[in-house]
Each structure stands twice: as structure tokens, then as C-alpha cells.
Amino acid sequence: MKSAMTSSPLRVAIIGAGQVADKVHASYYCTRNDLELVAVCDSRLSQAQALAEKYGNASVWDDPQAMLLAVKPDVVSVCSPNRFHYEHTLMALEAGCHVMCEKPPAMTPEQAREMCDTARKLGKVLAYDFHHRFALDTQQLREQVTNGVLGEIYVTTARALRRCGVPGWGVFTNKELQGGGPLIDIGIHMLDAAMYVLGFPAVKSVNAHSFQKIGTQKSCGQFGEWDPATYSVEDSLFGTIEFHNGGILWLETSFALNIREQSIMNVSFCGDKAGATLFPAHIYTDNNGELMTLMQREIADDNRHLRSMEAFINHVQGKPVMIADAEQGYIIQQLVAALYQSAETGTRVEL
């Protein structure tokens, strides 16, 4: 699955030259002497040119297939709009590249399954940038859960909520290109973090409700302006995931919701021995009525993007490190699809 260490730098290409390609992928790659950013591709050639110039002398392309054939990179970051993750990831894998793909993995579970199977068949690393699981908080809490400190966890609550945060840039309000709204954009992050800490328990069923009450009525928020006439994603979604072990995960996510807080991105866990919150990581319990804190981080770790990218490259180089792998990406894609299906049909979805 992994390439051997070599003396020459790994050649890296980026498909999709938007904000995340700049702030996360290119900025990280250019900090390492064992990596060389050799190509940037975007259908908007001027966008690719700007990113390439910012980080050196990478060649610029508007056709990913032509770029892959000509440049022959070792590693590709897929940062294109969600609709193209499947196409661009398969293209890169079949060109012999290891791939770091932005979330979500794809638009459907079937696509995510094919991406996973293709990577396995070709012996290439496919990872997804579910970076919240790489926070020190998440890593420490996962260790404590594995060691049984919380006991049997029977209720988990994952919240990715914005009060007035519809993105006014990109394609975030376009369901055809994005696949959905807050669930597939920010809710998916807390869903992955929760599932990771829980150890990816087997899912029995999913039940959800979604709402579109604000985005089609307003046109401006704290994250910019949008056109309410073309707003086609949900404002908010609420769902319950039931596990075969008897536990449940309650998920809340929104771009726009009339709550007091401007933003909430957190997960809480209730076990029969102790409870915990994730950001920052706290574990708490009681001893015959005496409230006790068993673990407490004062400030949540902010280097999670860096740790995610670092883990991917180290894994490609053959180091035994954890990544958000293709199989887990498929499971998360299944859950997202089931939540949307349940919300759209008004019925429980069995998995």
C-alpha cells in the first residue's frame, strides 16, 4: 500500500485551487524539503496561476487528465468541488498517484466504495482530510475511551452549528455541485470525530429531519452574500444514528439557525462510568455525589490540519501512522447519504 522512502522529493500536484488548496494543502507541502509542488490544476486557469505563483514555480493546468499524463506526480491533493472528488480521485489513482482528498469523499456511497476498492487494488494510499480527528484532544480522548475510562458510551451528541454562517463564496449553496448543505460541509467533520472516538461502531439505523427556512428568505450573513433564489441546500439537519451495540449518536448541524451562540463545533460522550466533551477535551464523573474532573485540556489543539497532512505524507512514505483512510471515508459517506435519505423521505433508514 505504501511507497518506500526515496532520496528525491515526492512530486506533488493539486487539483482545485480554492481556499483549502491554498491554506491547507499547498501551505503544508511547501514546508517540507522531501516534497516538491510541481503542478496546480483548476478549470479557472487564473486561479491555478495565482496559487502556483504564491508557492513557487509549479506548472499550471486547466485539464487534470493532461496534467497527470504530462507531469506524472507521486502525490495528488484533490481540492475540487465535491461533485468532482470521485472523478478526480479515480483519475489520480489510475495515474499511479497517492491521493489526499478533501471531504466529503464523494457524492454517493457507491462512488466512495469504488474509490476505496480502486486504491486497494492499485496499492495506493487514499486518505481524506477529516482533520478534527487529528487534534490532540481527539487523540487523547480516543485513548481514554479505548482504555475504558468512560465505560459503555450510550449517548453521543455531535454538534456543528452556525447561527448566521451561510458561506457566501464557492458553491456551498448549490446542491448539485456540493451534494448538500451544513451536513456535508461541517456536520461531516463532527460526525467523523465522533465515530473515530467511538471506534466506528456498527450502525443499525438512521433517522433525520432537515429544514430550509432561512437561506431562501435572506441573502446576507456573517460569511457573505448569496442568492436566495438559487439556494438549494438545507439550512439545518438533525438526526439520530442508532448503533447495534445499543448506543445512539444525536447529530445537529446548521448554516443558519436562531441559537444564542455564533458557532458550536463539539462532541459530547456519555458513558456509564464518566462523560466527556471533545474541544477542549474534558472527562468528568462523580464519586458518591462529589463532582470530579478526570482529564482537562485548557485550550483545544489548533494544529489539526497540519497533523492531518503530515500523517498522510508520513503514511505514503511507509511510516506506521493513522490516517482517515478510504474504508472509514466510505462509512462516513454511507451515514451522510442515509441521513439525507431519511430527511427527504421522512422514514427511518436501515443499514
Swiss-Prot record:
Entry keywords, A to Z: Carbohydrate metabolism, NAD, Oxidoreductase
Superkingdom of origin organism: Bacteria
Known catalytic reactions: a D-glucoside + NAD(+) = a 3-dehydro-D-glucoside + NADH + H(+)
EC primary class: oxidoreductase
GO molecular function, one term: nucleotide binding
TM annotation in the entry: none
EC number(s) per entry: 1.1.1.-
Reported function: Catalyzes the NADH-dependent reduction of the oxo group at C3 of 3-dehydro-D-glucosides leading to D-glucosides. Probably functions in a metabolic pathway that transforms D-gulosides to D-glucosides. Can use 3-dehydro-D-glucose, methyl alpha-3-dehydro-D-glucoside and methyl beta-3-dehydro-D-glucoside as substrates in vitro. However, the actual specific physiological substrates for this metabolic pathway are unknown. To a lesser extent, is also able to catalyze the reverse reactions, i.e.
Family: Belongs to the Gfo/Idh/MocA family.
Name of the protein: D-glucoside 3-dehydrogenase
